[in-house]
Amino acid sequence: MSRMISLREAETLAVAALEAVGVPRWEAEVTARALIDAERDGLASHGLSRLPFYLAQARSGKVVADAQARVEVAGSVIRVDARHGLAFPAIARGVERAIPLARELGLVAVAIGGSHHFGVAGAPVERLAREGLVAMAFSNAPSAMAPWGGKRPLYGTNPIAFATPRRGTDPLVIDLSLSKVARGKVMLAKKAGEPIPEGWALDIEGRPTTDPDAAIAGSMVPAGDAKGASLALMVELLTAGLTGSHFGFQASSFFEPEGEAPSVGHLMLAFDPAHFSDGYLEHIEALFQAMLEQEGVRLPGTRRHALRRERGESLELPEAVVDELRAYAVSRV
């Protein structure tokens, strides 16, 4: 069963729940909006189903609820210390500093350390693209994938995202996990008591499984097999390596309430195309038009933009999620 709820009500309830565990108002608003935007864009595995885990970790101290990200700028590098708080405020601080600096310098890097769940990787790059910048984002995560040929998970599912502005229309957004599917989809299947499709994950012995519990105990299958595993290693080095954060095998779970902070890393790059060549926006349209001339082709990000327009100012959520959200807010957790 599902139920309709307005974006405004969903945000109000989520903010109240976050504030109740000690998250300051601005940080609570940024986090709530990120989760609701994920729901609106059809990315429920990164949406409001994550909120109970954030709240439980804030209560236990695994997440520093009142953390306020610290920002330092050195040349073209923006360093953000998330201070073991929620990721979204740290991401927002980095993005807001990156926009003017990228316009000035042409290329900047935002390196975020000591952080938490990155959320929808396409969200911050889309924000940068709407400011006329070409952007990339990378994040590591707690271990869920083994090196190719191994059984012990060492890498996270480690998303990569890219976005570019387009003239007169929505940005093109590429957002992908380096596992065959995002691990959050396995968590949703577990919560619903449903099996997962074969090919998503392996059990602890390295055998294909459709049992979400066995998948969580085992490892996710990398997208593109050995190629995906190599890209996941690259992301570990770009994120945890460059920021001094925990590698996937060192990071604690985003889902378990107890333990030390996950302390993962993120890296974002923002390019101002005007510093690289003239007529970038016109030039890239030639490629997009050649793609769209072929039947069945759509540009990446099209689906999320369409869902956003279709859903407008309301969400259709599972009844259990709405009830849970209201209960957290009313009880002040």
Curated annotation (Swiss-Prot):
- Give the source's domain of life in one word: Bacteria
Q: What InterPro entries does this protein's entry cite?
A: Mal/L-sulf/L-lact_DH-like_ah (IPR043144), Mal/L-sulf/L-lact_DH-like_NADP (IPR043143), Mal/L-sulfo/L-lacto_DH-like_sf (IPR036111), Malate/L-lactate_DH-like (IPR003767)
Show the catalytic activity: (2R)-3-sulfolactate + NADP(+) = 3-sulfopyruvate + NADPH + H(+)
Entry-linked Gene3D superfamilies = 1.10.1530.10, Hypothetical oxidoreductase yiak, domain 2
One of the record's GO molecular function terms: oxidoreductase activity
Record keywords? NAD, NADP, Oxidoreductase
Chain segments annotated as transmembrane: none
Q: What is its EC number?
A: 1.1.1.338
Q: What class of enzyme is it?
A: oxidoreductase
Protein function:
Catalyzes the reduction of sulfopyruvate to (R)-sulfolactate. Together with SlcC, provides a racemase system that converts (2S)-3-sulfolactate to (2R)-3-sulfolactate, which is degraded further by (2R)-sulfolactate sulfo-lyase.
**Family to which the UniProt record says this protein belongs:** Belongs to the LDH2/MDH2 oxidoreductase family.
Q: What is this protein called?
A: (2R)-3-sulfolactate dehydrogenase (NADP(+))
